[in-house]
Amino acid sequence: PQDTAFWDERLRSIAAHERHLAFNRTVVLKFWLNLSQDEQKRRFLRRLQRPDKHWKFDEADVREREHWDDYMVAYQAAIRATHADWAPWYVIPADHKPTARLIVARTIRQTLEAMDPDYPEVSAERAQRLQRLAGSLKL
């Protein structure tokens, strides 16, 4: 829809949902894989030239390229409207797939390291119950 009120409300809903997730201790990371128009064209051509890649191609992709600038404006607006400390966007240069993948993987790793996750503690009472259950399963 072209209605800006529709999109404004949609973006507010997304931001509210992400805030709810973060409030409930869900870590939200968002990645925008920023592909240049030239690289997109190269990838489309490769898909068209290789029969084993035809399944990845949709004719609508070529038509939609005509609206590249409009999409960029919309993406930038969406990123601005939904970026928050509790739900950050990471804009990743994606023309070179291995580099993009490395940046995403490092970001996830750093986030997990900062979270310092650990297995939950098991109470002594529960540990005893589990031992009894294990004993009942032995032959």
Feature map (PLM): residue ranges:
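Arginine/glycine-rich "motif VI" loop of SF2 helicases in the C-terminal RecA-like domain
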Residues: 20-24, 81-84
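NTP-dependent small-molecule kinase module
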Residues: 71-76, 80-139
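A glycine- and Lys/Arg-enriched "phosphate-lid" helix/loop adjacent to the NTP-binding pocket
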Residues: 1-13, 21-73, 120-127, 135
